[in-house]
Amino acid sequence: MTNELVYEGKAKRLFKTEEAGVLRVAYKDDATALNGVRKESFAGKGELNNQITSLIFSHLAGAGIESHFIRAISETEQLVKEVSIIPLEVVVRNVMAGSLAKRLGKEEGELIPNAIVEFYYKDDALDDPFINDDHVLYLELATTSEMDIIRQAARSINKVLQELFNQMNITLIDFKLEFGRDATGNILLADEISPDTCRLWDKETNQKLDKDVFRRNIGNLTDVYTEVLNRLKQVQN
């Protein structure tokens, strides 16, 4: 196992492996908000997100959705296919919340009949601005056909995840996806799917089961992440 660091982000480190085209992802215990301005560490967070992401990506694979995920190799690590990340954050929204509610002057919790798919330019220096397809083409981030693939994949993933979280008695409010190109140019789902990247509300109480408890100082982050993992394990058994 090599320790040559390829990339370090807010929540993960990526390392080379002895196998060409395969990387090792190590999940960190750090939590950030306000695009990294606020940062704290929570013991066990990396382990929780690694397990949750591994289970969800495996579930998506069973539904025919390709991703970079290969397998988990430890409590905090997984192997993934090396991809070139497309600098787009793809956000799928099922219920009004967060920045969308503020932008449109709507109340949080209002159901969106047909899920909204949004794109944000992944650039910390610019604070990840909201962009549309024309901006994507102008910036040469992706082609028209790639955008079609990404948008369709996002909607397919949303359908599978909504069904999964419904079984967990959780409402999938919204979530962020990232995609990358493999060595042959195929578009694959990448990054992670966890309470770091999703808004999750308990169906009965509307209790927030995601990173909003950290952003808004309304609960214990590791407690709610553990609750999500436990519910996920129950429906996967």
Curated annotation (Swiss-Prot):
Origin: domain of life: Bacteria
Name assigned to this protein: Phosphoribosylaminoimidazole-succinocarboxamide synthase
PROSITE patterns: SAICAR_SYNTHETASE_1, SAICAR_SYNTHETASE_2
Keyword ATP-binding annotated: yes
Broadest EC class assigned to this enzyme: ligase
Gene source species: Listeria monocytogenes serotype 4b (strain CLIP80459)
Pathway(s) served: Purine metabolism; IMP biosynthesis via de novo pathway; 5-amino-1-(5-phospho-D-ribosyl)imidazole-4-carboxamide from 5-amino-1-(5-phospho-D-ribosyl)imidazole-4-carboxylate: step 1/2
PANTHER family in the cross-refs: MULTIFUNCTIONAL PROTEIN ADE2 (PTHR43599), SI:DKEY-6E2.2 (PTHR43599:SF3)
